[in-house]
């Protein structure tokens, strides 16, 4: 924040003495810094105009302007007078006020942040990209002040914001590259300007992808939205990123994780209304199978399956030499099967239904072995049983004549079929569509509706579907069921909490407890529901506990509204026992 004092402007060692400048001025036959043939009077007037602006003595260009002025024969007296009269000491006044604030007890860091944030807001408000580009061009090289600025997080953040607002500014584009060259590319993920420069974009892409892959599922959820937004900035960035991930996905070590990230980015692009299906197919194995590529591309672009294209694929995948199964393992394509086969009220031409079922089952169950880009075996052992399970559940789910009571009679059949992952996903989608109907819970008489009971079975059989089950339960828990009275709403929410406790008991512990902790902190959930959850959880858990679980769950128990309000039978008090166990076995962080 400190500014240079007026009396310490010139450093003779660096800028040369006044005499040397005078010699240059006398040697007019030598190179003219201010331009060959330029009129001395005009140069003097231009320089005097600059000297008369406020605080010009603080400008980085002061020395160059002085040099031009003296070379044009300017008088030192005029310079001294103008610079002195127009010196208002804005920077020094800020420093003085900052010192006063610190002396009154304000933390120095807080003072610095206040000054910097105010300066940032002023720069963003008054930034002129044309002036910035002209100053940059005049410098002829990277200004020292710019290199100093990018060394600080505050000013890098300023450049990111300015670059977003002024993507065509050459000075900002160059600055973003400088920041990337300095090793800060991990910060640039949200800057669209970075997407215009291949060198910067490739660095940012590499750093961002490494960050996602190193952190597992939790890191994926945290960083994917920003990563996907950057990749989907334009067709060129999407193609470049997907091509790179397509190559990395072939690696034995970590290839499947990269493929997952690529598929999540495809989903993001689709949700934003972009049709990237042709790029997806071109980067896969579809290019070698033009008929299959055409059929897939047509359905993906329209967002719907159709009998003609399904028939093309069916013939190819029932032939003696079918295409690679990877061809139809496109998440967006499989989602279309979920809608066609499991959505209530969906209509499929009965003559073609077996083709739909066969292709979905084939994608879900067939295992291929490849060596040196050549397929050496196709294992179809589970194809028939998977097809049968999909068909059975499809007939149950899409039969509008079957009510809840009829479904109860078919529960054992449903439970058997749910053991197949693809069927479990279909049932989960079907349950979501069914219970999301506004009048669904109004018509239920059972304490635990059969559709919610199916979620328990899915949680038991399929760990990979735990996040989707919790997502559905949270959505239902937070929905305003205005058609039910207050007591019915409480009972429904207790039932949903019971499903969450079951999910917790099957291993999805931290996400469930984290959600309830947030409910308690936001104060938007009836406290009796939190007590119900705590009671049920204490009933199913036992030592040893992980530190992460204790740090999340213990504060819920110690909350004033929870502690001492849970009734227990006899001498057994699980709340007190849990708290005592934690305090004796863990170092608790407040």
UniProtKB/Swiss-Prot annotation:
Pfam families: TH1. Residues 15-43 are annotated as: Disordered. GO terms for molecular function: RNA binding. Residues 21-43 have a biased composition (Acidic residues). InterPro entries: TH1. Its main location: nucleus. Keywords: Nucleus, Repressor, RNA-binding, Transcription, Transcription regulation. One of its GO terms (cellular component) is NELF complex. It is found in: Nucleus. One of its GO terms (biological process) is negative regulation of transcription elongation by RNA polymerase II. Belongs to the NELF-D family. The NELF complex is composed of NELFA, NELFB, NELFCD and NELFE; NELFA and NELFCD form a stable subcomplex that binds primarily through NELFCD to the N-terminus of NELFB. Binds RNA which may help to stabilize the NELF complex on nucleic acid. In vitro, the NELFA:NELFCD subcomplex binds to ssDNA and ssRNA in a sequence- and structure-dependent manner. Interacts with ARAF1. Interacts with PCF11. Interacts with NELFB. Interacts with KAT8. Essential component of the NELF complex, a complex that negatively regulates the elongation of transcription by RNA polymerase II. The NELF complex, which acts via an association with the DSIF complex and causes transcriptional pausing, is counteracted by the P-TEFb kinase complex. This is Negative elongation factor D. It comes from Sus scrofa. The gene is NELFCD.
